[in-house]
């Protein structure tokens, strides 16, 4: 069992380490012209502001749900049961960390992929940058998920004396609840990112169409329209971070 646990934590750390390596590699690439850097920075600032505010809202919801879980399981087991609530919070932290890294790499990789295509005119070089940027999100999802499961098992598997089969059978109810609450914690962040980012994107998209094209006669997806920047902010949060976390 100890060997399997070591394998799990090593796999998680390798995934996160390689994700960090690719993150740094993509960030070192040239952003391109001043105009490209200006637009990318505007999207980056907007995405940071959006996800920071969103995570504050998630934090409030998480605290409320954790308290409810503690109350429900305490009544169910006839004693104060804090374990499922802690596992729920661990899941939230792991998922939020993966989502934040995914959003950051998206805002860095987008402009660098465009600049690589502009400079090299080579699809292979362009895809290499795109895949390296995309791998960061994928590796972080797997790495943080494994790290969270490792923590849940180490803290509550060993801590609740559920190493042997018989002991695990005796305490399977609370341990199963711990795993379920961990998964729910991961899912709730994905839901907020996906739904919140999607609504934000659609609102900005409609605003850009109605005001930009209809009233101001600005072409679609023109960066002079602030709603276009907001649309791209929502894409980075909802379509990159949110969609990746759902899987």
What does each model-found stretch correspond to?
Residues 2-247:
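Hydrophobic, small-residue-rich transmembrane alpha-helices and their short perimembrane loops
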